[in-house]
Amino acid sequence: QIPVLSGYAEHAFDSEYALKDASFTVVDPLQKSSTIKADNALKSVTVFDLLLPTDGTYKISSKVNYPIKYALHNKVWKPFYEVSAQDAGELAKRDYVIADDFPKNQPPSFQEIQREWTLESYVTKNKVSTLNAKNDAPIQVSFSVHPNQIKVNQAVQLNVSKSGKPLKNAQVKF
């Protein structure tokens, strides 16, 4: 078995917040699916033990969402955060707005959305195996090589699609 750690992070491998009420789907090398509910009280990371009884690749996935409040500022919708002006700094240097960015006599128009993430990770025990599991994420990403065989300085082609059709102008960040 191995520990699986996940969380919200601005920088890779530096989790800041645990995933609340996260449920993980695990597809084993034999294509059997199971669900794991992480049960921990940590604030910075969500942790669970993953049993690896069979050699091959395990796909771990989860869907999480988080409500985000947007405010209309100068005809542009921007994320709205409850932060003091002192902590936020200059408006020109940030991509969000706070209450102090609006005139006192003109409350902002708000809109709340649910931001949803589909998280996927792959763990391989001893040897890689074919990934056959159906992907029901709104946006699918497939690799030209097995995800656990990607190496530093190796070119990898990604296919990004939505509803089975190529997604035009997709932006990918690593």
Residue ranges and their predicted role:
Residues Y17-K20, G164-F174:
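Short, ordered, surface-exposed loop/turn motifs in non-cytosolic proteins
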Residues V45-L52:
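Exposed aromatic-hydrophobic patches
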Residues F24-S34, Q171-F174:
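Short amphipathic beta-strand segments in non-cytosolic proteins
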Residues Y8-A12, V160-K162:
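Short solvent-exposed capping/turn motifs at the termini of beta-strands
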Residues V64-K75:
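Short acidic/polar inter-strand loop motif in beta-rich domains
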Residues T35-L42:
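Short beta-strand segments within Ig-like beta-sandwich modules, predominantly Fibronectin type-III
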Residues Q1-I2, L91-V156, S161-K168:
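Beta-strand-rich domain onsets/edges
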Residues D55-T57:
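Extracellular Ig-like/FN3 beta-sandwich strand-entry sites
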